[in-house]
Amino acid sequence: VKKVGEASRDAARVEVPFEFIMPPRDQWWTGSAAKGFEVAIGRAGATRRQLFQVGRGTAQHALVAGKTGSGKSTLLHALVTNLALTYSPDEAELFLIDFKKGVEFKMYADRRLPHARVIAIESEREFGLSVLQRLDGVLRERGDEFRRAGVNDLGGYREAKPDVKCPRILLVVDEFQEFFVEDDKLGQEAALLLDRLVRQGRAFGVHVLLGSQTIGGAYSLARTTIDQMAIRIALQCSDADAQLIFSKDNAAARLLTRPGEAIYNDGNGAVESNSLFQVAWLPDDRREQILLSLRERAAGKYPPPLVFEGSAAADVAKSVPLSALIADANAVAGPPVVWLGDPIAIREQVKFAFRQESGSNLLLLGQNEEASLALVTAGLVALAARYRTPESRFVTVFDGTPDDADTAGVLRNAANALGLPDAVVPRTEVATALTGLAGEVERRARGETDDRSPRFLFVHGLHRVRDIKKADDDFGFGKRDRVAGPGELFARIVRDGPAVGVHVVAWCDTLHNLHRAVDRD
């Protein structure tokens, strides 16, 4: 019975090869998006290609609904890939956001799709919101530019200024309802921005495609916004969604029975606008071949996409400012900077600048020792790239990593590789090093030296470096009558050092242990 069922399912499967819809190789990147996008996504009937068209009349934005296994991802891949074949990156830009716990858009990031400006994989809501904010900024920028040119829309602007590149933009958000899973300020702002993009994007060449397994329920977009999206594409979905995506008297979506079978409707769901079609099938290996060909065709003429991968740590090797600093020590002006990671937003990398002012120290707090070690090491790399000196005097490292830990010796190896062989101080010499560094701070503060060159003390595992911990019997009495201990010297460096160019970068596992190690002040 099982075999009969599988055979029946296979017999019902319809497969339209992607080659049926893709343009010939000599026509790649020849399309003009001045008046809109026109991209084949499947086969309607025996020989006709089903076109996805936006930019003309009321057909400006699209809503796609399809339950798991319906072929929604296949549809998105066919659309994105064929659009990238039809139009050059000068004509079309893509902003791709995937809220699912999957990797639907990862291949576009790995192969650096030249049309993509932003690719979000397993995206956080905050990053998705920043994409909407960026596109809202595009609306304002283009609005100002169009007014100066005396035109009303993208087509008119392209005619008035044919030499100025102004690509048409398509925003694709899969599982868009994730914006609204919480009734908070972020969800409210996302709803307002999406509504603005849908209502105003038409004139400025910005189009929106929203996909979801279900568009019903509380976690969805306002009906007034959905009503502005004339293009509806339904794959297999529930009866409730079949009525929601089309009009109440259009129940055709309930009759869809196989994966990839879909209805294209560009009349706000009116039954007379239904067009039954089969989504083109694009295997992963074929898609990868196409993307590699597109990357070769781009030949480095276009910037790589901004990629946000929610489940992946930031890759320091991909830091553009750090790479520039490594290539040229003078590439970054101003105070010393360490880069800490990627923001959950479209903006420059998260960084900390060590200015010569009180409090300019960096505290890392948290129990993820691997992450803290990565941050400390990345900081050493950035500073070593900035201050290329044969001496390691500008940086001192106290490593509190246990000798039997898997990460033991990582900081010492990193320092050696960076040409800082004496940076990591043996534990028996911590007190001596603190005395010397505190003395340097005092000499600078008193004006006994003109040296203000930056110096850094890295403490990895503040809670484990015993010499730094404040004495349990230190109640503040008689301090003038005794020599300051290592803990007190460390406190002086933290308090007085930044103003004279001596800074501390310290990691501690918990706030409780931090208070045990050093005074709150």
Residue ranges and their predicted role:
Residues 1-10, 238-312:
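Conserved P-loop NTPase
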Residues 6-23, 284-340, 347, 382, ...:
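Extended alpha-helical interface modules used as scaffolds for assembling large macromolecular complexes
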Residues 8, 153, 158-159, 313:
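Polar low-complexity intrinsically disordered regions enriched in Ser/Thr and small residues
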Residues 22-153, 159-247, 253-255, 323, ...:
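P-loop NTPase catalytic phosphate-binding loop
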